[in-house]
Amino acid sequence: MFWKFDLNTTSHVDKLLDKEHVTLQELMDEDDILQECKAQNQKLLDFLCRQQCMEELVNLITQDPPQDMEEKVRFKYPNTACELLTCDVPQISDRLGEDESLLNLLYDFLDQEPPLNPLLASFFSKTIGNLIARKTEQVIMFLKKKEKFISQLLKHIGTSALMDLLLRLVSCVEPVGLRQEVLHWLNEEKIIQRLVALIHPHQDEDRQSNASQALCDIIRLGRDQGSQLQETVEPDPLLITLESQDCVEQLLKNMFDGDQTESCLVSGMQVLLALLEPRRVGTEGLVDSFSQGLERSHSVSSSILRGIEPWLKNFHQLLLNPPKKKAILTTIGVLEEPLGNARLHGARLMAALLHTNTPGINQELCRLNTMDLLLDLFFKYTWNNFLHLQVELCIAAILSHAAREEQAEASGSDGKVEPLQGSGDGNGKLETTPSITSPPENTMVTHLFQKCCLVQRILEAWEANDHTQAAGGMRRGNMGHLTRIANAVVQNLEQGPVQAHISEVIRGLPADCRGRWESFVEETLMETNRRNTVDLAFSEYQIQQMTANFVDQFGFNDEEFADQDDNINAPFDRIAEINFNIEADEDSPSAALFEACCSDRIQPFDDDEEEDIWEDDETRCAARVMARARFGAPHVSDNYSKNALEHGGQDRKTGSAVARNVPGLAAPSSPTQKEGPRSESDSAGTTWTAVFDEPVNPLSATPGAARDVGSSAWAAGPSVVEEKGWAKFTDFQPFCCSETGPRCSSPVDMDHSNAEGGQSPGPEKTFGPTSPCAWNVCVTRKAPLVASDSSSSGGSDSEDDEKAAGAVEAVCTGHTGKVSPPPRTAEAAVGRAECPDSTVLAPACPAPSEVTISPAVATIAPSKAGSPTATIVVSSSVAAAVPPGPIVAVTTAAPAIVATLGTMTKDRKADALPEGAALNGPV
């Protein structure tokens, strides 16, 4: 919006450019000149690219400003001129890089005598470096023409900006071919030898330091770019020169020639440390001194090791007699003989040499007893942690490289040939020569534990520190590194590759020393490690703003919350009990399951009326079961889920219901079975079977219609009903036990009225005198007779009650119920159990019943005892597994069924049908 409505103020640069005699300084006084230049204001660029303006800009960055100017504005114009020349505008870069007169004017800055102005030198280096990146070929060709360029550059090497310019020539030239050309040109100019010559005691410290830093950067840049540029086959010539033995020897000669100065020694050792650094295999990860990639570095730096080995005695002497230093005041007092930077770098060099694992160097260090000297310095300078770290690295290198050597021997032997000794040849290769003596690493380990007395020194230093602390003194500053050294020894003693060797050394100690070491490891060191492993996070000092008992008082007490039992959302607390998993057989494919679900839930439009009737009933039952399960009731068993998916669609087409298994119920019968169950006494008499093949009358069929009994239920023996896992509904009034609940939809009992003229409830009926339901929430009451007349009155009801003495009705909400033996007379009343899902039939014995679902079959068979009472079973979904005996199961069937089965007398006695008669009427 700012630019859209032209709210920006017009730059004053354009107004100045419209003037006839505008000067460069007037434009540079404007604050927005750099923004206008980067925005490529054409009028401004045309003005700046004039020859006079370009010469003036170059003079500003190469000549010292007048001394009489105010200091705060003295370098204002040189700084602005440098920014204008290096603002990455192609027009300015081309104008400066292609004009040789401007380049000569810029190059004249190197003709000055040192020291150069550091700020102007930075302007010059930045401008030349930008030209090298933008106009590489032109600038390189121009510099090559200058024979004294390298000499003049090294003359001002004491200025850090000129050292940066040298590194730009080495690393910032593109493409690769041109870069190799520049490297060869610099190598021909002997830039490496000249830099090494600058590391000399007679040179200035700044020149020595910058020369050393330049050599270190050349080493690192050469190795990094060599690993990144995989297409480069030709090695870096500068790196090859640096790694040559002659160059290393010349450097060491300059370091120890004549009077030794700390700056010269430190600068030279920095270059040696850079040469001994492990070579990086790439940008994926760094290869440390313990990795497998170190051998490649050793093979490259073998000339370095050969050049260093003759000078090890000089480094040992340096550790003994360093350059003299004055006493310094520290926080713990005056240090009369400081360790010094030279000895610290000497210790770093010893650690780096030990990491190379060169046998010749190891043997020379053992001969010189350098490790013993380093341990002396370790315990002498107790507050120099830099030294402590290097000594720890030396010990770790000795132990770790012994491990690597033994691993190499194990991998090289095939079990048949005698192990070979690995001896280095200086280039990282192993010479497999038979030997009886121990490898060099073991020699170094022996020297460390026997000659240097590492164990005794650890114990003595620890005991001395304990005495000091007991007397009220401070804990020594090297105790942390001493603990790590002791842990490294213990680790290699227990499971390290030099375990046997160290164990032998420990056993060779005097008895008192060995006992002290064992006690130290088992008690003192273990306790120290335990204290060191304590997590310091979330300590008391980090929560000082909190009170001590904040955690105890945080939150609310239980009594502050209201009881949630009466909450309407309390049932949803058990939402986690809902099982959303539909387990299917592993053999059933997903497509078959999907089709089964579709056929189970969706009915075709050409279904018969009776199928819709049974479907409505099952849907209501299933909905009620799911409602219970949602509020914590037990879930339907796994078999129900599988059978419902597999047989749901087919069972409805054949007039049967989906098999449902609940705890304690028998397995469902075959959906194609048409005959009713037979008892064991069927062979003794004729069985009368009722077949229900006629269409169902929609007016007489109700959702509470009874289910038939399958043969599989008869085949299964009675089983004990398990009631565990069922929900308890004692907290509220169950709907099944309500006297004023909804009337049963059964046509058999719907027209029966009570004494007051109202309709009596008509639940489904089952024999059983006073058997409570499985959940023990039912009430015992008198039940009406099996069937009733629509014209019955209250008086007839009372008469029926008298005839039905002893009969009870068990109204429950479960699937199964425990019942008692039925009455012995045909006039016995009917006990019935009303369930939301199915009809429960009472067996004729005290054994618990077992109910399941099966196709609609009604069978009448003579009882075993020959009683005139026939066994009548009418159901379509529930089967009762009962033992042989008289059974009368009266369901909520239509009056037509009762008329077909037998004649209803005035006193409501049912006459049995003749044997062999078949019932084909509607159910």
Curated annotation (Swiss-Prot):
Highest taxon listed in the record's lineage = Eukaryota
Where would one find the signal peptide in this protein?
none
Region annotation (Disordered) maps to 409-441, 662-685, 743-766
| UniProt keyword annotation of Nucleus present | no
- Sites of Phosphoserine modification: S289, S746, S796
- Fetch the SUPFAM superfamilies from UniProt: ARM repeat
Could you give a GO molecular-function term held by this entry? protein phosphatase binding
InterPro entries to which the protein is assigned, alphabetical: ARM-type_fold, SAPS
Q: Tell me the compartments it is located in.
A: Cytoplasm
One GO cellular component term noted in the UniProt record for this chain: cytoplasm
The yes or no answer to whether the keyword Phosphoprotein is present is yes
Q: Where is the composition biased (Polar residues)?
A: 430-441
Keyword terms, alphabetized: Cytoplasm, Phosphoprotein
Q: Which body tissues produce this protein?
A: Strongest expression in bladder and lower levels found in heart and pancreas. Very weak expression observed in all other tissues tested.
What does the record note on quaternary structure? Protein phosphatase 6 (PP6) holoenzyme is proposed to be a heterotrimeric complex formed by the catalytic subunit, a SAPS domain-containing subunit (PP6R) and an ankyrin repeat-domain containing regulatory subunit (ARS). Interacts with PPP6C and NFKBIE. Interacts with ANKRD28.
Briefly, what is this protein's role? Regulatory subunit of protein phosphatase 6 (PP6). May function as a scaffolding PP6 subunit. Involved in the PP6-mediated dephosphorylation of NFKBIE opposing its degradation in response to TNF-alpha.
Q: Which family does it belong to?
A: Belongs to the SAPS family.
Q: What is this protein identified as? A: Serine/threonine-protein phosphatase 6 regulatory subunit 2
- Source organism per entry reads Mus musculus (Mouse)
Q: What is the lineage of its organism?
A: Eukaryota, Metazoa, Chordata, Craniata, Vertebrata
